[in-house]
Regions:
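Class I (Rossmann-like) S-adenosyl-L-methionine-dependent methyltransferase catalytic domain
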Residues: 1-78, 99, 103, 117-132
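Hydrophobic aliphatic residue packing
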Residues: 41, 59, 87, 108-111
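A short acidic, Gly/Pro-enriched loop at the edge of an enzyme's catalytic core
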Residues: 76-87
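A short glycine-rich, Lys/Arg-flanked "PGG" loop and its adjoining helix->strand segment in the class I
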Residues: 102-114
Length: 132
């Protein structure tokens, strides 16, 4: 089980203050995505919705954080197939075992328009949950 207090501290204090250090996060990613002129950007597992107001036409969802546009998980998100030009999955699709991750990827990819882009970041070497 994920320690919500620890996760909240991480996203509000550690991650937010270091986001600029990652090539595909922060302002570098904002400029790259906005240059594509997307009609819809989905931030899958947006946490505090860092990119809201920075990336045009962005909608974020997260199962926990109230800053998200939708409070839901990958399988409950209200998106139709092939609706998004860009999807961000920056650390949100690396929880669970290989089957869980594969199912999440299949679901999220189904929202991507042909020729769309998926920006993804996961835990190097995988992540072991309490389920395996």
């Amino acid at each position: 089980m994920i320690d919500q207090e620890a996760q909240d501290y991480f996203y509000r204090h550690i991650w937010q203050s270091n986001i600029h250090l990652f090539k595909y996060s922060g302002d570098n990613l904002v400029d790259e995505i906005n240059a594509l002129k997307p009609k819809l950007v989905i931030d899958a597992g947006c946490a505090l919705n860092f990119f809201k107001g920075k990336i045009k036409n962005l909608v974020g969802y997260d199962p926990v954080f109230e800053e998200a546009d939708f409070i839901c998980g990958h399988f409950d998100a209200p998106f139709k197939p092939e609706c998004a030009d860009v999807i961000l999955a920056l650390g949100s699709i690396n929880w669970g075992d290989h089957d869980d991750i594969a199912h999440m990827l299949i679901k999220v990819k189904s929202w991507l328009k042909p020729g769309g882009r998926l920006y993804m970041r996961g835990a190097p070497g995988g992540y072991k949950s309490d389920r395996g």
